[in-house]
Every structure is written in structure tokens, then in C-alpha cells.
Amino acid sequence: MAKRDYYEVLGVAKNASDDEIKKAYRKLAMKYHPDRNPDSKDAEEHFKEAKEAYEMLSDGQKRAAYDQYGHAGVDPNMGGAGAQGFGGFADAFGDIFGDIFGQAAGGAARGGRGGPQVYRGADLRYSMEITLEQAAHGYDTQIRVPSWVSCEVCHGSGAKPGTKPETCPTCHGQGTVRMSQGFFSIQQTCPKCHGTGTYIPEPCAHCHGSGKVKETKTLEVKIPAGIDDGMRIRSAGNGEPGINGGPPGDLYVEIHIKPHSVFERDGDDLHCQMPIPFTTAALGGEIEVPTLAGRASFPVPEGTQSGKTFRLRGKGIKGLRSSIAGDLYVHVQVETPVKLTDQQRDLLKQFEKSLAEGGARHSPQSKSWFDRVKSFFE
């Protein structure tokens, strides 16, 4: 069965504030909590649905992903935006664009009934600047990122050599404690051991009891051709390590494309401003323009006006999800000559005089504009 819209579940508008979302969730949680409806499967499902909606909409990144892509943007099992067609990159650099916005850092789940909580490692993020050419053609590079590794002194236990972690006396190794609040009996993470089920009487001096130390590691990054500004590449398992056997987090490389001196990108299309002499605009001719693949030329017809746009098909960028390249839009700007010689001025005056004899035949836009101005004042 298709999932309901999260905003609909909580009964709030899409532009609802964080406080409005929280209040709506609390109201539903009180109404459908299993302790208040012990024999109602329907109430249990409503409670789970509200809890899931709140978890997504109360997290800024997840909410942004959901607003843009819907359930596919926050559910890794649904193959969200950009998740298809990139198996070839997975071997070199994880699952490209799989679950683009990732999960909340340090998510917890119980490792087993009665056992300590298992924590997923936190995600890491790395910002990288590349050129438009690198984005268009693809780019292989290396990055150096900080990484947490197991402490070699205590071998990851966090305890001073010769000692070992002991069972937490507060939760008796469960990782959680149960507290009663009014109608509810709430299970929460043990405040002493933070869900590990153990505590360390004598911490390792090298890692200060964390069981891990930070080092810098080098990763190969394969940036696919057609990547756009703001997109992220996910390197699975290269985030921080998990706790109590939990899976490691992921590394997200966020791509930023430097401004280009000639082109502006719009999706798979490119735009450029091309100055042309007024003689070419009047008489027509062939002009040459740069493209990301080299030079290209196209004819300019007689009487071309400044601001005219020419479309060169297939001279843009081949996008990630496209089998064909976008287009290049050339916006011509007719240049007016400056610093004329006396001879050039005389020639232009003769030319201007000859134009007056032709009237609107030579300047149709000017004639149309003056006609509109005249009717405006009448």
C-alpha cells in the first residue's frame, strides 16, 4: 500500500514550522500511543505512521529531501532521485547518488532483544570545487579526509591495557532503562553507558576511552560526466565507525562548480554571449563560437538584431540521466564601433543618409516602436 504524505499524516501544511510539526505529532502520539490503546492494531499503525512522519519532517535535511523527491528522497529502498543507472561507478566509489541526503548521523537500533543498542556511525561531508569542463567530461581525483580508526593501544576497547570494560551497573548491560511518566512507560538510552551496556572504569589514555583515534586517509573519487552543481556523491562506509558493531556511516562529497569565463550552465544546456561586428549583423556571415568540445561555426543571416539567440543542438552537456547532450544557446550582441576616424564617420553619415531614403524597409523595429510611442501620446 502506498505511503501517505507525511504532512497529511500529521495534519499540517507543507510550510508548517518546526513547532507546529512538533505539536501535531505530540497530539497524535497521545491519542494513538500503544499504552493507551493496548488491543488496537489500528491505533498502533497510526502511532507508527505519525512517528515516521515526525522523524522525517523534524530533520532539516530529510525534510528538504522529502519536499524535493517525496518518499523516494528519504527511503533508500525506493531508489530515490538519481539512484538508477550508475552501477559502473559503484566499484570505484560506492553507490553514486543512492540516498542522496543520507540518514541522520549516529542513528541507533537495538542489536538484539535485551542487548545493548547498536549505533550507526555518523556521516561525514566533504565539499569539492571542480571546473565546468571537469563536470561535463567526468573527473578522477583523490581527496584526503579525516577518518576515525580503531585505537591500536587498546585495540578498540577504550579500556586501559590490562583492564577491560565492565557491565554497566545502571542498566545491567541492557543499554536501556525504563522510566514511568504518568500513563506511559518509556524506554530510553541508559544515561551512564549511553546505550553500550558497559562502562570503562579506567579509560585508555591514548584514545581517552573512545576506542578510536582520528587519522587522515586518501580516497579515490570518480566524478561522473554530467554532474551538476550541488549534487552529492555517496561513498558507502567511509564515514565514522559504528558503535557496538553498528554499521559505519557514509561519506558525502558535495560538488560545487566554479563560475566559467564563457559559459553559463542551465541543466544540460549552455548559454554564452557572443559579440559580433555590426557589419556582420547587417550583411550576414559565418561566425565561430567556442564549445566544450572545441570550436563550432554557424551562419548569421542578414539583418540580425542584437539579442538574437541562436541554438546549436547537441553542443551542451550530456546529463547524468540523458543519452543525448543539451544545446548551446548563443546570444549575439551587436557591437557599435568606437574611436572612428574622420573617413569612417563620413562613410557612416553617407550610409545613414541612404537609410533615410528606405524608411521602415531598413529599420522595421524602430518604425514599429515609434508608431507605438506616437499612438501612446495621441
Curated annotation (Swiss-Prot):
Residues 5-70 form the J domain. GO terms for molecular function: ATP binding; heat shock protein binding; unfolded protein binding; zinc ion binding. The keyword Hydrolase does not apply. It holds the Pfam family DnaJ_C. Keywords: Chaperone, Cytoplasm, DNA replication, Metal-binding, Repeat, Stress response, Zinc, Zinc-finger. Participates actively in the response to hyperosmotic and heat shock by preventing the aggregation of stress-denatured proteins and by disaggregating proteins, also in an autonomous, DnaK-independent fashion. Unfolded proteins bind initially to DnaJ; upon interaction with the DnaJ-bound protein, DnaK hydrolyzes its bound ATP, resulting in the formation of a stable complex. GrpE releases ADP from DnaK; ATP binding to DnaK triggers the release of the substrate protein, thus completing the reaction cycle. Belongs to the DnaJ family. This is Chaperone protein DnaJ. InterPro entries: DnaJ, DnaJ_C, DnaJ_domain, DnaJ_domain_CS, HSP40/DnaJ_pept-bd, HSP_DnaJ_Cys-rich_dom, HSP_DnaJ_Cys-rich_dom_sf, J_dom_sf. A zinc finger (CR-type) spans 138-216. Binds 2 Zn(2+) ions per monomer. One of its GO terms (biological process) is response to heat. Zn(2+) 1 binds at residues 151, 154, 204, 207. Its main location: cytoplasm. GO terms for cellular component: cytoplasm. SUPFAM superfamilies: Chaperone J-domain, DnaJ/Hsp40 cysteine-rich domain, HSP40/DnaJ peptide-binding domain. PANTHER family: CHAPERONE PROTEIN DNAJ (PTHR43096:SF48), DNAJ HOMOLOG 1, MITOCHONDRIAL-RELATED (PTHR43096). Its cofactor is Zn(2+). The J domain is necessary and sufficient to stimulate DnaK ATPase activity. Zinc center 1 plays an important role in the autonomous, DnaK-independent chaperone activity of DnaJ. Zinc center 2 is essential for interaction with DnaK and for DnaJ activity. Gene3D superfamilies: DnaJ domain (1.10.287.110), Heat shock protein DnaJ, cysteine-rich domain (2.10.230.10), Urease metallochaperone UreE, N-terminal domain (2.60.260.20). Zn(2+) 2 binds at residues 168, 171, 190, 193. Transmembrane segments: none annotated. CXXCXGXG motif repeats lie at residues 151-158, 168-175, 190-197, 204-211.
